[in-house]
Swiss-Prot record:
Lineage, top ranks: Bacteria, Pseudomonadati, Pseudomonadota, Gammaproteobacteria, Legionellales
E.C. designation(s): 3.6.1.7
Signal peptide limits: none
Entry's Gene Ontology molecular function annotations: acylphosphatase activity
Xref: InterPro entries: Acylphosphatase, Acylphosphatase-like_dom, Acylphosphatase-like_dom_sf, Acylphosphatase_CS
PROSITE patterns attached to this UniProt entry: ACYLPHOSPHATASE_1, ACYLPHOSPHATASE_2, ACYLPHOSPHATASE_3
Catalytic reaction annotation: an acyl phosphate + H2O = a carboxylate + phosphate + H(+)
Keyword Membrane annotated: no
Name of the featured protein: Acylphosphatase
Entry's family note: Belongs to the acylphosphatase family.
Keywords, comma-separated and alphabetical: Hydrolase
Record-annotated active site: R25, N43
Organism for this UniProt entry: Coxiella burnetii (strain Dugway 5J108-111)
């Protein structure tokens, strides 16, 4: 395992609160691209937002902190995330 591989991780996260209809997914995509992360983000039918993000551990930690803020119109009440097996995505997409 290379040093780069040791420093990379993926997370699966669910964000709750007023996170749909407030440009949350697009804001996550922009933040992820800014942090050079790959993965995806999508709305869930019950009102939460789900995402998978992969990249350098420091960038992932910045994203997990940012998820509590989101875009100005959002009102985040909870963020649950866990590390998962590293997956290989070519970019970050809104689903």
């Amino acid at each position: 395992m290379t040093q780069k591989e040791k420093n990379e991780t993926c997370i699966h996260a669910t964000v709750s609160g007023k996170v749909q209809g407030v440009f949350f997914r697009e804001s996550v995509r922009k933040k992820a691209e800014e942090l050079q992360l790959t993965g995806w983000v999508k709305n869930l039918s019950h009102g939460d937002v789900e995402l998978v993000a992969c990249g350098e551990r420091d960038s992932i930690m910045i994203l997990t902190e940012w998820l509590w803020e989101g875009p100005p119109q959002a009102a985040v009440s909870n963020v649950n995330w866990e590390e998962i097996v590293v997956e290989d995505y070519s970019d970050f997409r809104v689903r």
